[in-house]
C-alpha cells in the first residue's frame, strides 16, 4: 500500500522535514490540520512504528523510582532550619546575643528570605513553562510519529534534572549568604562589634562617677546591662578593659573625667555638691582620689596588688595637679595647727 503512491509519500516526507525550519505562528493550527488530513499520514505512522520496533527502543521505568538529589535535600533542610524556606520563624542568633543584634540579624535575614523566594519563584515559573512547552510539542509530534506517554514524561524528567542545577546554585548561594550573615554577628574573633553610643555614654558616666572605686557590684552590673541592652559579662569585660586603658593613657583619661564631671555638674543642684562631683570626699582627699582612683589609702581592702601589679605612681603623669594637691594638703594642715 505504501509503494502505490510514491509521489504522495515523498511529498509528505518533505513536509515533515520542513517542520524544523518553520517558526511557531498563528498558521500552525492550519498546517497541523493539513497534516492530519493528508491521505498518507497513517501509512507514514505505520512505517515509523515498524522502524521503532525493529530498533528495540525501550523506555526505562525509573522515573518514579529515582531518589531525590541528596545535595538538594541537605540544602533544603538547612534553609528550613535557618528560617529562609518554609514558614517565617524569625531567625535567632541565640540567647547570648543582645536585643539590638537580634533585631539587626532578623532584618537582614528577612531580606535574604525575600530575595530567595523571589528567585525561586522565577526559577519554578521558567521550569514549568519550558516543560509544558516540551509536553505540547511532543504531544503534537505523537500525531505523526509514535511517542508513548512514558517517553514524554521521561523527557520532561530529564529537562527537570537539568533545571535542578540552577536550583542547586540558587540554594547554595543562599546558604552561603546566611552563613556569612551569622559569622558577622557570632564570630567575635573575625569582627568585633562595638557598643552603641548610648551604651558607651552610660558606662563611661558610671566609671568616671565612681573613680574612687571603679569596681561595680553585681547588682550595679545587672542594672548597667539592662540600661545598655547588653550582657553582664560584657559589662564586666568593658570595665576591665577601661581600667587598663585608664592606666595606660592617664592624660586622655583625665580629660574624659573632666568632661563627665562637667556633665554631672550641670545636673547637680544641691549646694556645694555642684562644684565637686566627688563631694563625698573632703578637700585634698577628693583631689587625691581623682588623681589616683587606685590609691590603697583611699579604698580600704582595695589595691592593685591583687591584680599582680604595684601601686600606681601618678606624679609622673601630671606633676601640676599633684603639686596643687600637695599645696592644698599643706594649707589644710596649717589651718588645723592654727
From Swiss-Prot:
Residues 11-91 are annotated as: PBC-A. Residues 188-250 bind DNA. One of its GO terms (cellular component) is nucleus. Residues 4-187 form the PBC domain. Disulfide bonds: none annotated. Changing residue 245 to H: In mu290; egg laying defects, abnormal migration of QR neuroblast lineage cells and BDU interneurons, and vulval protrusions. Loss of expression of dopamine pathway genes, including dopamine transporter dat-1, in midbody neurons (PDE). Residues 94-187 are annotated as: PBC-B. It is found in: Nucleus. Keywords: DNA-binding, Homeobox, Nucleus, Transcription, Transcription regulation. Disruption phenotype: RNAi-mediated knockdown results in egg laying defects, abnormal migration of QR neuroblast lineage cells and vulval protrusions due to ectopic induction and defective morphogenesis of vulval precursors cells. RNAi-mediated knockdown results in the absence of the transcription factor, mls-2, in the M lineage. One of its GO terms (molecular function) is transcription coactivator binding. Expressed in head dopaminergic neurons. Its main location: nucleus. GO terms for biological process: animal organ morphogenesis; anterior/posterior pattern specification; dopaminergic neuron differentiation; embryonic organ development; mesoderm development; mesodermal cell fate specification; muscle cell differentiation; neuron development. Interacts with Meis protein psa-3. Interacts with homeobox protein nob-1. Belongs to the TALE/PBX homeobox family. PANTHER family: HOMEOBOX PROTEIN TRANSCRIPTION FACTORS. Transcription factor that binds to the 5'-TGATNNAT(G/T)(G/A)-3' PBC/Hox lineage enhancer region of sem-2 to promote cell fate specification in the postembryonic mesoderm (also known as the M lineage). Required for the M lineage-specific expression of the transcription factor, mls-2. Required for asymmetric division of the T hypodermal cell, probably acting via the regulation of asymmetric expression of Meis protein psa-3 in concert with homeobox protein nob-1 and the Wnt-MAPK pathway. This is Homeobox protein ceh-20.
Amino acid at each position: 500500500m505504501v509503494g502505490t503512491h510514491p509521489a504522495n509519500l515523498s511529498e509528505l516526507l518533505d513536509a515533515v522535514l520542513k517542520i524544523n525550519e518553520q517558526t511557531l505562528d498563528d498558521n500552525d493550527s492550519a498546517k497541523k490540520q493539513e497534516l492530519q488530513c493528508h491521505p498518507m499520514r497513517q501509512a507514514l505512522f505505520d512505517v515509523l512504528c515498524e522502524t521503532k520496533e525493529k530498533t528495540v527502543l525501550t523506555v526505562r521505568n525509573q522515573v518514579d523510582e529515582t531518589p531525590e538529589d541528596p545535595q538538594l535535600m541537605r540544602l533544603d533542610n538547612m534553609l528550613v532550619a535557618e528560617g529562609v524556606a518554609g514558614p517565617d520563624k524569625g531567625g535567632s542568633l541565640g540567647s547570648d546575643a543582645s536585643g539590638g543584634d537580634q533585631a539587626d540579624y532578623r532584618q537582614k535575614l528577612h531580606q535574604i528570605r525575600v530575595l530567595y523566594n523571589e528567585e525561586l519563584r522565577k526559577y519554578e515559573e521558567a521550569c514549568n513553562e519550558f516543560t509544558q512547552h516540551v509536553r505540547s510539542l511532543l504531544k503534537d509530534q505523537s500525531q505523526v510519529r509514535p511517542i508513548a506517554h512514558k517517553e514524554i514524561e521521561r523527557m520532561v524528567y530529564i529537562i527537570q534534572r537539568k533545571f535542578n542545577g540552577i536550583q542547586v546554585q540558587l540554594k547554595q548561594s543562599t546558604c552561603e549568604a546566611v552563613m556569612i550573615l551569622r559569622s558577622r554577628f557570632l564570630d567575635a574573633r573575625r569582627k568585633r562589634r562595638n557598643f552603641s553610643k548610648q551604651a558607651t555614654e552610660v558606662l563611661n558616666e558610671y566609671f568616671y562617677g565612681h573613680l574612687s572605686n571603679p569596681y561595680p557590684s553585681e547588682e550595679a552590673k545587672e542594672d548597667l546591662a539592662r540600661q545598655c541592652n547588653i550582657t553582664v559579662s560584657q559589662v564586666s569585660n568593658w570595665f576591665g578593659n577601661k581600667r587598663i586603658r585608664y592606666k595606660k593613657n592617664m592624660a586622655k583619661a583625665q580629660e574624659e573625667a573632666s568632661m563627665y564631671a562637667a556633665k554631672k555638674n550641670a545636673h547637680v543642684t544641691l549646694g556645694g555638691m555642684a562644684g565637686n562631683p566627688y563631694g563625698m570626699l573632703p578637700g585634698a582627699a577628693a583631689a587625691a582620689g581623682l588623681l589616683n582612683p587606685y590609691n590603697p589609702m583611699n579604698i580600704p581592702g582595695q589595691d592593685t596588688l591583687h591584680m599582680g601589679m604595684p601601686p600606681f605612681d601618678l606624679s609622673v603623669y601630671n606633676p601640676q595637679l599633684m603639686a596643687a594637691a600637695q599645696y592644698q594638703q599643706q594649707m589644710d594642715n596649717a589651718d588645723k595647727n592654727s
